[in-house]
Amino acid sequence: MIQTASTISSNGGTNQGMESSSANSPEMNGTQNSMSVGMSGSGSSQNRKITQFSNKLYNMVNDSSTDSLIRWSDRGDSFLVIGHEDFAKLVLPRYFKHNNFSSFVRQLNMYGFHKVPHIQQGVLQSDSPNELLEFANPNFQRDQPELLCLVTRKKAGSQPVEESNTSLDMSTISSELQNIRIQQMNLSNELSRIQVDNAALWQENMENRERQRRHQETIDKILRFLASVYLDGKQKPPSKVMPKSRRLLLEAKYPTVSPTNEPSAHSRPSPQGTTANSSSASISSLHNTTPDGEGKYRSVQNGRALNYVSSFNSDSHSPKDYISQSYTNEPGLKKESADSFNNSIDSYISPNQSPNTDVPSLNRDDTTDPKVVNTGDIINMLDDANSIEGSNMNSLSPLLFDYPNSLYPVNNTSSEQHHNSYRGSVSNSQPSGNLSESTNLQPVQPVDYMSNSNPSYGSYNAEDQLTNFHPGYAMDQKRISKLSDGITKQDQNIQALADILGIPLGDGKIDDAGFSANSPTNLNLPVSSDLDSVLNIPPNEDVFPDSNPVFDEFTNISNLTSPIEASNGNTFGSNPVSLPNQQKSVNPSLMTVSSPRQVRKKRKSSIGA
């Protein structure tokens, strides 16, 4: 007799079984109805149905007469099928309406059974002639028929779980898209702030350059005042007189030679008169000549250069001719020494070209004693010879004042570029090695330091100033525009993707104040969406006010000592400007400066006293 799982009640937690007909009876024939099974759970009974397939399978495995074809495993948590062909022919038709073993395996898979693999299944030749198959289910165990109600068929019950997962995925995608859109807006806002800050920085740079130009003009006025102090008796253009602080530099840079056998300053003239040679006559005339009235600031040293400067009053010859005549006619001096000195005068103080600062080397073989020529002698000599014109004074100004490189370079013609030399460079015509390697001087820039011809930015509006004088501003704006366009396209792609998925995206607005406060790139610059308002920021006059008393004092003095042509006009001469990488040419006629405001009345100071 085969005991079947007929009815299991939950009264007292005990199971009651009922006997059924024999397995060989025709009533069994795989048509038993499923019976209700009650399970105990926390004091409340719950009725569940046992499926027909699980009931038939349990009876089939428990039948001891078919143990040669199907039986329980040793552990009782699975069953074994031995010889599936014989099992399909002899056992399956008794419980099911078919004898197809493949259909039986498919039903097992539908009810949650899985095949247990064995080692012998992977070999070519097994030990047993019949193939052994094992199937297991966690709820299908020996002597536990109460678990059969848990053996259910896989239905569409798992679909709600999948739908919930799908809905969860859609919500996740929606939140992620919203976060991406917020990040895109953050980047767009940050780029806008960077663009405004960049424009503000460029504008501040322009203001600083304009302020530096004004400082340069003030320094020029101060230098004119200081130069007027050294005028010897008559009103001369202050640009032709060198400050005293720079004379010492030229005294060290331009040494000359004096003969060792130089006669005394108190020596008497040669009694031979006309019978003496030309050289002694020249020396005698030089020694007997007294300095002129205008030689107030000339050197008091006794030397050939001093005597020459004191006695030189002719405009018919250049300084080179007189120096050559004085030195070549002197007995005991070599002609090559005079030639070297002529070359040095020609190449270093020639008014026709930019000054060369290579120091000439002295001929050590000469029997000469090197002495330093006073800087005032050189300048007064050139002044008396009228060899320095107003246009050529600018080429000498780097020597006199030794300014650093200007921030406003001018256009150089081919001839000017040819004459532009570098300080400390070795020339083919001049000996090298006289300038120490530690002296790292900058190249001479042909900048007009003694005139107010530096370019003015005041005649341009803010946008034109940034475009004309700062090509990097346009490049920065172009790069920022490309980044902004890329972010806009990404935002459009995100919106299109959200529309395809049917996900509504919010505006994603950000608190600008909070973002600006927490932003690490906040430079405390003016934050504004209006670019024009930033570009039109008025310059800060607190740094260098026009009402500075020292500035006004020097302005008054400079106006008194400046040349007439430099103080009358409000517009300076045309000076074509060529800034690095400048794309647009600047019209020199636009380079005008607004008329300076009225200088306030000169206050009483100790300078006039």
Curated annotation (Swiss-Prot):
The modification Phosphoserine is found at S350. Keywords: Activator, DNA-binding, Nucleus, Phosphoprotein, Stress response, Transcription, Transcription regulation. This is Heat shock factor protein. The lineage of its organism: Eukaryota, Fungi, Dikarya, Ascomycota, Taphrinomycotina. SMART domains: HSF. GO terms for molecular function: DNA-binding transcription activator activity, RNA polymerase II-specific; DNA-binding transcription factor activity, RNA polymerase II-specific; RNA polymerase II cis-regulatory region sequence-specific DNA binding. It is found in: Nucleus. InterPro entries: HSF_DNA-bd, WH-like_DNA-bd_sf, WH_DNA-bd_sf. It comes from Schizosaccharomyces pombe (strain 972 / ATCC 24843).
